[in-house]
Amino acid sequence: SSVNARPCSSPLVCPAKGENFFGVGNVARIRRLPPHLAWCSIDWDQLCLLHLLGSGGFGSVYKAIYHGATVAVKKVKRCSKNHLASRQSFWAELNVARLGHNNVVRIVAASTCTPASQDSLGTIIMEYAGNCTLHHVIYGTGYLTGNNSDSLKCDHGFLSTAQAVIYSHDIVAGLMFLHSQLIVHLDLKPANIF
């Protein structure tokens, strides 16, 4: 019988701390990205968090500057109630890093180690898509944060039929691409569409 030794993007196959890996003695566990994602490790000296954009069940998203460019930084928190789900969410999001499409946010860098905060499962730096979400466009709501220097540039009028068709086309194009890669977006809502 043969063993499939291809790289795995999930850390779930690794032994727990102190356990043996394929019968080999104690090996120090180093949290790192799989080889196919090594290109995207974070240069921490070049990252400057500006302010919180929002937070959800698995973490928080910040506006930041990375190598002089405006980016979004997602810090995936360790979930004490559902650690497995938070790990799977982090690694599933990193699997998208290899993809490139105009309607899918590009991942710039990522790390499973966070120097400033040990309660973080990992950090993902993504291209910054702006503050204005489809939710803001539909409902004409104001700022994502109370930070007036980072105002939204949304048209607070009614969403026209032409605009709705453009948004729908872009959403469907992005989803069709993800589905062609066997990836399903599990949190699709107007607040997550930029």
From Swiss-Prot:
Keywords: ATP-binding, Kinase, Nucleotide-binding, Serine/threonine-protein kinase, Transferase
Assigned EC number: 2.7.11.1
PROSITE patterns in alphabetical order: PROTEIN_KINASE_ATP (PS00107), PROTEIN_KINASE_DOM (PS50011)
Broad class of enzyme this protein falls into: transferase
Binding-site list for ATP: 53-61, 74
Occurrences of domain Protein kinase (ranges): 47-194
The protein, known as: Serine/threonine-protein kinase mos
Organism annotation: Atheris squamigera
Gene for this chain: MOS
